[in-house]
Each structure stands twice: as C-alpha cells, then as structure tokens.
From Swiss-Prot:
The chain crosses the membrane at residues 19-41, 142-163. Belongs to the FAM168 family. This is Myelin-associated neurite-outgrowth inhibitor. Induction: Up-regulated by different neurotrophins, including NGF and BDNF, but not by growth factors, such as EGF. Predominantly expressed in the brain, including olfactory bulb, cortex and cerebellum (at protein level). GO terms for biological process: axonogenesis; gene expression; neurogenesis; neuron differentiation. The modification N-acetylmethionine is found at residue 1. May form homodimers. May interact with DAZAP2, FAM168A, PRDX6, RBM6, TMTC1 and YPEL2. Interacts with CDC27. Residues 1-18, 164-194 are cytoplasmic. GO terms for cellular component: axon; membrane; perinuclear region of cytoplasm; plasma membrane. Glycans are attached at residue 45. PANTHER family: MYELIN-ASSOCIATED NEURITE-OUTGROWTH INHIBITOR-RELATED. It comes from the Eukaryota.
Amino acid sequence: MNPVYSPGSSGVPYANAKGIGYPAGFPVGYAAAPAYSPNMYPGANPTFQTGYTPGTPYKVSCSPTSGAVPPYSSSPNPYQTAVYPVRSAYPQQSPYAQQGTYYTQPLYAAPPHVIHHTTVVQPNGMPATVYPAPIPPPRGSGVTMGMVAGTTMAMSAGTLLTAHSPTPVAPHPVTVPTYRAPGTPTYSYVPPQW
C-alpha cells in the first residue's frame, strides 16, 4: 500500500487537508452530490419515458409511438427505384436516357491496366456523349453512270461505243537515265538509312 495515498472510507466527507478552495468539502458548489434523477433532462418528456421498470427485459419497440410492428415490405431497399437515377450498362433501359433521336453512350472508364501504364488522362469522369442516330446512306436509283434512266445496256451501248473519240495524243518522249555498270562500287562506306 502506498503510504502517501490513503483513500478515505465511503461516506466520510473530504477533509481538505491542503486547504484547496472547495467551499463545503465538495467541488462545484454542491454541499452534497445531487439527487439521482432517472431522466437526463428535468421535467416530464413524453417521448423519453422515465426509465425501465425493474424486472422487465430490455427491449425497444419497432415503432415507439404506436407500439405496432411496421408493415412488411418485400423490398430490402426503403427507397423506391425511380427516386434517383442510376447509370446502368444498358442506357436504353434507363428511364432517364433519351429514347428517340439520340442514343446515349454509357460512361467510359478505361480498364485499370490502361490507366496504370499510360500518362494520358483518361476521361473517367466525363459524362456520356450524346451522338445522333446513324442515318443510312441514301439508296441509289440503280442506274449505272453513263446510262439514261429507263434504258437497258443494249439500248445505250451503241450510243456509247459509236460516240466521237478525241484525237489521239502523240506519245511523249521519255528519257531513260544511264545506270552505273554492275560491279563493286568505288566507295566502301554506305551511310545508315536512318
């Protein structure tokens, strides 16, 4: 037992041997400890009852106001599905995607190995780009170039073949360079190709 520390027995008022300025042997101006109250706050509060009666097991009702069990819900999520938009991998099934003229592209995120090995900033946080629906190219009339619509090849071939041809052009003079004779070159150093 430490001789310096000798706790006083219970119920004995504090002697205050060193004269510390406690007025009546108890700090904070109390002559004795305040009486115990089961309520944390003074006064009656209908929401917080005074306490549990001795002998009752500790159990809190699911609905403190009425005591009734809340109604059963088959969904584990207390929020409805359509309250907040969720970006899905299939944007056409989302009620917030534009259904008609424009398709929505899902959010793009590069795979982790691409982000890890490159210094290019990946557009991970960019919103989905909206691009117009593809328009098919216009269908041609099925008529070959040089033919008149409504005719067959046999009808138009005679006109095409007997048409006047321009005057033929004389052949152009071509100069062929003189090449080095085969054999060992006169120089031995070949510069690199890069």
